[in-house]
Each structure stands twice: as structure tokens, then as C-alpha cells.
């Protein structure tokens, strides 16, 4: 009884987010262990936004002690913490946000950990990195790339924010697309649906039954009549044909005894649904591309569960599905009496379950072939894929090593964007120049007030070096160089809070396997409240 009460309280606590990613998404988040490297203002804001939703555990790796500068920009450090280990101080205060979350800290620099315990970071679900020098960042990124652990790099620098997501192969079965067409199969009704629609004689219905007939029935009957009139088995393709179908539906509105044609909401819904519900049942291009991927075509003992399921889905489409994906088993809201709506809904659900079982059988056959246990992939996994097969996506990211390699860098994208005066790419280039400056002088430009003018000249030189490596001439952006030096690498809390929250969104996407992560670089300009993403 106590356990049930605890679960009920937990559901109430996380109710709003469970509506977004479901109980299974919440369970995935609660099983995640996130590492934060360096408890900067941006880093702790990112942790805050994943601790509040209930991430399972977090660990802060930081070898620094708290300074007055830290306290001035970081809400999760106070004056009593000055001189204490920053990892410990931040962990203790962050843990107060949510007693359900486990917190830990390591008082060690990431450089030291990478040198003496290089596999340490491979044990986390996601790693968030802040305030790392370029050399350390690239070393960490390479190890995480090889280990298959996602890395989220975030940074706030004056009025500018930056997020870089490094993830190798990341399948997303629940993408939650904004605009989804109904999956009613009206162009190819399955036997149970056809029998249900044919069993309803609209002429013999009472007025009440007539005005409460689900629009799916009205639409399919009208489509049958339209196809018969036109000698075709296809769907209406152009506006003229769709208008003709709408006219057919409107003519079916019953004229009452007083000879007045009263509005019937279900018929109005049928007219509106011509565009939304009368769509061809096809396999989307993105899903076809996954079917033709070498990882899908060649299943081995090393294949990941996602690819085994995709191969089973491909085989289903080519066989039982007759060229179509599994039925989703959902039905939109509509004007209808309860009895017929429930019957119709159960028909779709039964057909969806039949398709799930067909795909699951194929999954089991594949697992048996490659010598994997049956529970390697559960029926629930297959059901989730079948329900979302129309929108499944695979993210294949680029490594930081490729981005920083002059031969593999997306130079064309960068230089083309630089030609646009409104593009935020200039700040990405300046971040690269700032890191080059730090590597040369062991401090950030503008950090010391008395060296500001000298640093401006030095940063211009660093910027020129970066551009030269990309085969570009100098860029006349002196005002931006001055601005970066004026920042002096300071973290403004308002910017850090925004960037940290955005980084937390990406961590949650990765941990839950839902929603498509950004690809792959995000720049935020707080001066103009503008942001832009780039694939770098």
C-alpha cells in the first residue's frame, strides 16, 4: 500500500512532464546517470534543469575551489563556499532541488582523470562539458565517441551562448512530430474496417443515428461512390477531384421532415477530413532510407536492437504489410455515439495488435538466427516501434575530431554563412579564435583590464590564423572582436541560465530517446535575442 502511495505521489509530482514523454520516458530519465564537467554557472543551470524533472543520478567532476567570481555568477554557490571544493559545494546545493535524485562529486581535474582513468567517463549516460580547454575537450570527445556516450558541450561567454552536441548513432522512435496525418487506411481498408462500414446502411438509420455516425464511415462510403463514378480505385488527387468528393458528402446530409437541411457535425467533419484523412498509405522517404541502410540489410550478432527491429519491420512491409507500415491503432476524436466509436476504435487497435505480433515474430526469428536471447528485444519495444514507425528517425552525428580537422571541417558552410551579415556563425568562428588565443597565451582575451587593447590585436591575429587554415582571407568584423575581448570570458547568469536550460533539453532527449536532438551546433546571441543552428 505504501509503495502504491509513493508511486501516486510521484506521478502527481511529475505529471506535466509525463504528459510529454510518458511513463516509459520518465523511467528512462530516472535510470540515467549524467556527468557534469566543471560546476560553472552554465553547467549548474543545465544540471538544475535535469534534476528537477527527476534524472536518476548526477556526478560533478571539478578540481577547482570556489572563488568570489564563481559566487557572483553562480546561484548554486554561496559566499560560505568560497575556498571549498567547487564540485562538493555545488553538489550539496543542487541535491536540495530534488530528494529523488542521487548526487556525487569528484574533486579532480578532468585532465587528471583522462590521464589516469581514461575509461571513467564511459560509464555515464550523457556527459555535459563546460569550461574545458580545446586540447582536453578533443581528448574527452574522442574517448566518448569511441565509447558511444553522447557529449553535450555548453558555454556562455558574455552575451553569447554555444551548445555542441556530439552523438554517434542515436535512434529516435518517438519524434513527436508537430503535424501528423491520420492513419485510417481509407485508401486500402483492412477487412474488419470494410465489413464494419458495409454493415451500416445510412438510409435506414434514425435521425439521431445518422447525425452520430463516425465520419470515417461517411468518408469511406463517399469515397466508394466517387471511385465508382470515376471508374478509379485511387484517391482524389487534385482540388477539383477533392471538391467533387466534398460535394458528394454534403449531398448526404439528411433533409428533415420540415424540408430543412440542418447541419450535421459529423458530415462537416467528414468534409474537413478530406485533406487530412484521405492520404495514400506509403512508407515515408526517411524510413525507406533506413530500410536500405547497410546496418539494416546485414544483421549480425553485433547488431543493435534498433537495427534488428528495423529489419523485421522492413520484412513485414514487404510481406504481411503489402507495402505498408503497421497500423498505428489510433483514432482521432469525432462526433459519434459511444457504441460505434468504441467498436471502430477497437477495430483499429485489433489490426494494430495483429501487425505488432507479425513484426514481433519476425524479430524473434532474427534473434534466433544471430544467437541472441528472446528477451534481447521485448514485445513492448516492438509495439513502440510499430506505433511510431511513420516518424522514426536516426541521428548520425559528426565527431568533434572531424569538426576540428581542417580537412574534414564544414568549411563551405562556415564561409558561406559568414557572407551573411545576419548569421550568428561569426560567433562560432570567434569562439575558435578565443580558444586559439588561450592556447597561445594561457588566458582569455580581455580577462585583465590593463591588457585589453593588446588582447584585441592578439585576438585579431588568432582569428586570422583560424580563417587561414580554412583557406579564407581576413574578415572585417573588428566590432565583434572588440566585443569578445570586452566580455573577458565572463559568464552572465541570464545567458548561462538560458544556455543551460537548452543544454538540459538535449540531455533529456538523449536520455529518454524521444524528440529529435539538435544537429549539431547551436549559437545564441543575447544581444539580439537571436539563435541559429549549424551542422558543423
Where are these regions (language model features)?
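Adenine nucleotide-associated cytosolic modules
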Residues: 1-536
Amino acid at each position: 500500500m505504501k509503495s502504491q502511495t509513493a508511486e501516486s505521489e510521484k506521478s502527481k509530482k511529475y505529471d506535466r512532464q509525463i504528459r510529454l514523454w510518458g511513463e516509459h520516458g520518465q523511467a528512462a530519465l530516472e535510470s540515467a546517470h549524467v556527468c557534469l564537467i566543471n560546476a560553472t554557472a552554465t553547467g549548474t543551470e543545465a544540471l538544475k534543469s535535469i534534476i528537477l524533472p527527476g534524472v536518476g543520478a548526477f556526478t560533478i567532476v571539478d578540481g577547482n575551489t570556489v572563488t568570489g567570481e564563481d559566487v557572483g555568477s553562480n546561484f548554486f554557490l554561496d559566499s560560505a563556499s568560497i575556498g571549498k571544493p567547487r564540485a562538493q559545494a555545488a553538489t550539496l546545493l543542487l541535491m536540495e532541488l530534488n530528494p529523488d535524485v542521487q548526487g556525487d562529486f569528484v574533486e579532480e581535474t578532468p585532465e587528471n582523470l583522462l590521464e589516469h582513468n581514461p575509461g571513467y567517463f564511459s560509464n555515464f549516460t550523457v556527459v555535459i562539458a563546460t569550461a574545458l580547454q580545446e586540447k582536453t575537450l578533443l581528448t574527452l570527445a574522442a574517448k566518448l565517441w569511441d565509447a558511444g556516450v553522447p557529449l553535450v558541450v555548453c558555454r556562455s561567454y558574455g552575451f553569447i551562448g554555444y551548445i555542441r552536441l556530439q552523438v554517434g548513432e542515436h535512434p529516435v522512435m518517438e519524434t513527436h512530430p508537430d503535424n501528423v496525418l491520420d492513419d485510417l487506411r481509407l485508401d486500402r481498408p483492412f477487412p474488419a474496417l470494410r465489413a464494419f462500414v458495409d454493415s451500416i446502411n445510412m438510409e435506414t438509420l434514425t435521425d439521431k443515428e445518422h447525425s452520430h455516425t463516425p465520419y470515417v464511415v461517411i468518408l469511406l462510403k463517399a469515397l466508394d461512390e466517387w471511385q465508382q463514378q470515376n471508374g478509379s480505385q485511387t484517391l482524389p488527387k487534385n482540388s477539383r477531384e477533392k471538391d467533387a468528393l466534398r460535394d458528394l458528402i454534403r449531398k448526404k446530409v439528411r433533409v428533415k421532415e420540415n424540408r430543412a437541411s440542418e447541419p450535421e457535425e459529423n458530415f462537416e467533419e467528414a468534409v474537413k477530413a478530406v485533406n487530412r484523412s484521405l492520404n495514400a498509405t506509403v512508407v515515408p522517404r526517411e524510413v525507406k532510407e533506413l530500410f536500405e541502410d547497410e546496418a539494416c540489410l546485414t544483421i549480425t550478432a553485433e547488431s543493435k536492437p534498433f537495427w534488428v527491429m528495423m529489419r523485421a519491420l522492413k520484412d513485414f512491409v514487404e510481406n504481411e504489410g503489402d507495402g505498408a507500415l503497421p497500423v498505428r491503432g489510433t483514432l482521432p476524436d469525432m462526433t459519434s455515439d459511444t457504441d460505434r466509436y468504441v467498436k471502430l476504435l477497437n477495430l483499429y487497435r485489433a489490426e494494430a495488435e495483429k501487425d505488432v505480433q507479425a513484426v514481433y515474430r519476425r524479430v524473434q526469428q532474427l534473434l534466433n538466427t544471430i544467437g541472441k536471447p528472446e528477451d534481447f528485444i521485448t514485445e513492448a519495444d516492438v509495439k513502440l516501434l510499430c506505433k511510431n514507425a511513420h516518424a522514426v528517425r536516426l541521428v548520425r552525428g559528426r565527431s568533434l575530431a572531424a569538426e576540428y580537422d581542417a580537412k574534414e571541417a564544414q568549411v563551405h558552410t562556415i564561409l558561406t554563412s559568414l557572407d551573411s551579415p545576419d548569421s550568428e556563425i561569426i560567433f562560432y568562428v570567434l569562439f575558435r579564435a578565443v580558444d586559439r588565443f588561450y592556447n597561445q597565451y594561457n588566458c582569455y582575451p580581455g580577462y585583465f583590464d590593463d591588457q585589453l587593447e593588446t588582447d584585441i590585436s592578439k585576438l585579431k591575429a588568432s582569428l586570422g590564423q583560424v580563417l587561414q587554415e580554412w583557406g579564407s582571407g581576413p574578415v572585417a568584423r573588428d566590432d565583434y572582436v572588440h566585443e569578445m575581448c570586452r566580455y573577458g570570458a565572463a559568464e552572465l547568469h541570464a545567458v548561462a541560465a538560458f544556455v543551460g536550460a537548452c543544454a538540459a533539453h538535449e540531455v533529456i532527449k538523449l536520455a529518454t530517446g524521444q524528440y529529435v536532438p539538435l544537429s549539431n551546433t547551436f549559437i545564441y546571441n543575447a544581444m539580439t535575442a537571436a539563435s541559429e543552428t549549424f551542422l558543423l
